[in-house]
Structure formats: C-alpha cells, structure tokens
Amino acid sequence: MLSPKKVKYRKKQRGRLSGEAQKGNKISFGEYGLVSLETSFITARQIEAARIAMTRKIKRGGRVWIRIFPDIPYTKKPAETRMGKGKGGVDHWNAPVKLGTVMFEMAGVIEELAQEAMSLASSKLPVKTMFVVRRDLR
C-alpha cells in the first residue's frame, strides 16, 4: 500500500477540504482518466483496491497511473481507552481529493475496456466519479 517514506511531522490535525481542484485536474500521462465529482479523503487501501480492479480488468494490455498519493496521517486511539494521554497512533494514510481531481489515468487499451476498468475502480472508491477521455478535456 502507498504511504510516505519520511514525513516532517508524524501526526497532523484533521482539517477540511473545500473548493475545486486547481492542480491535478487535467489528464497528463494517459488517454483516459477517472475524475472525482466530490470532495473527500481516500485511504491507501481504497486506492490499492481500485488499482488492483483496473489492472486485473485490462490484464497486460495497458498502463495505469495513480495521480493521488496518501500523505495525510489519520490517527486513532485504541478501543476502550479513556480520553486523554495524548493523541493516538497513526492508523492509516489518506489522500485528499477535491472535486475535479484526476485520480487515475490509463493508456494502451481500447476505450470500451478502459471505461469498464474505470467503472470497476469507481465502485471501490467513496466518491462519485466520471470517466473522461483526453480529447474531451481540450
């Protein structure tokens, strides 16, 4: 699963996401993309599940790029622990995804297969998504 090798601070405050994506909202590498229609945090496990679903569908035919990276730590205290005694340990890593962010890209396969693969990946994610083609975004 994806996670940062080294971070400046181990723990971070939750924060909030708002607005549309200013960066990462165009297809840069492939021909097809999966764009977020909602704002949310996506876990490293969800990204990995989507990646596996796509690569299994396209077999060895094409190439997949993951355009988001989980670099926000999510902490959690153990079950049945009293309040206090400091912030909990890092439970998992999240990737911030704003409306309009291109999350995955794909190339080297026909459009119908790419759409099916992206649909499978979309079902693994907690946000509504849209399949886009590079020629549509120009």
Curated annotation (Swiss-Prot):
SUPFAM superfamilies: Ribosomal protein L16p/L10e. Transmembrane segments: none annotated. It comes from the Bacteria. GO terms for molecular function: rRNA binding; structural constituent of ribosome; tRNA binding. CDD domains: Ribosomal_L16_L10e (cd01433). One of its GO terms (biological process) is translation. The keyword Ion transport does not apply. Keywords: Ribonucleoprotein, Ribosomal protein, RNA-binding, rRNA-binding, tRNA-binding. Pfam families: Ribosomal_L16. Residues 1-21 are annotated as: Disordered. InterPro entries: Ribosomal_uL16 (IPR047873), Ribosomal_uL16_bact-type (IPR000114), Ribosomal_uL16_CS (IPR020798), Ribosomal_uL16_dom (IPR016180), Ribosomal_uL16_sf (IPR036920). Part of the 50S ribosomal subunit. HAMAP family: Ribosomal_uL16 (MF_01342). Binds 23S rRNA and is also seen to make contacts with the A and possibly P site tRNAs. This is Large ribosomal subunit protein uL16.
